[in-house]
UniProtKB/Swiss-Prot annotation:
Organism: Acorus calamus (Sweet flag)
Family to which the UniProt record says this protein belongs: Belongs to the universal ribosomal protein uS4 family.
Subcellular location: Plastid, Chloroplast
Gene label: rps4
This protein's name: Small ribosomal subunit protein uS4c
Subunit details: Part of the 30S ribosomal subunit. Contacts protein S5. The interaction surface between S4 and S5 is involved in control of translational fidelity.
Length: 201
């Protein structure tokens, strides 16, 4: 299944706020309507919608998300918590959380077009897994700097998560540590996502 490229508002009306997909929010009252509908949903649909929230927020294909679930299942600790850590530490998501890109698809485009360096080297793989002490900078080209600066100027990001530090003047971000689950950028029940996949096998 390919990455979603359809209408974004349609998705957030059904699934709720997906800040990684679009900076636009849901309409007033939509959360109440979703809660009203939730009484009529089957357990399968509830798990499916949580999975879809995760997939669309992080901009993943079905195959990519399934691969992350398998990796998380083999790691120590809670599968759901590890899954969120893996997704949050992707380079495209880190750029988004730093405010260097308006959305995760926007961050992915920056990486694909080779505007971003990690530890002084160009990285053009959006799924690159960032590690503690990684330094993320903009390529030393005027176009790259202007793109990032424009994104940062228009950013509506709230408090920066504790695992990141941003030097906005130098367009530089630092990964301090692996993200703590309470700083994940999406309201999600990750256990339902794990249950969804466990019931597919």
């Amino acid at each position: 299944m390919s990455r979603y490229r359809g209408p974004r508002l349609k998705k957030i009306r059904r699934l709720g706020a997906l800040p990684g997909l679009t900076s636009k929010g849901t309409r007033p009252g939509s959360d109440l309507r979703n809660q009203f509908r939730s009484g009529k949903r089957s357990q399968y649909r509830i798990r499916l919608e949580e999975k879809q929230k995760l997939r669309f927020h992080y901009g993943l294909t079905e195959r990519q998300l399934l691969r992350y679930v398998h990796i998380a299942g083999k790691a120590k600790g809670s599968t759901g918590q590890v899954l969120l850590q893996l997704l949050e530490m992707r380079l495209d998501n880190i750029l988004f959380r730093l405010g260097m890109a308006p959305t995760i698809p926007g961050a992915r485009q920056l990486v694909n077009h080779r505007h971003i360096l990690v530890n002084g080297r160009i990285v053009d793989i959006p799924s690159y897994r960032c590690k503690p002490r990684d330094i993320i900078t903009t390529k030393d080209k005027q176009r790259s700097k202007v793109l990032i600066q424009n994104n940062m100027d228009s950013s509506t990001r709230e408090e920066l998560p504790k695992h990141l530090t941003l030097d906005s003047f130098q367009h530089k971000g630092l990964v301090n540590q692996i993200i703590d689950s309470k700083w994940v950028g999406l309201k999600i029940n990750e256990l339902l996502v794990v249950e969804y996949y466990s019931r597919q096998t």
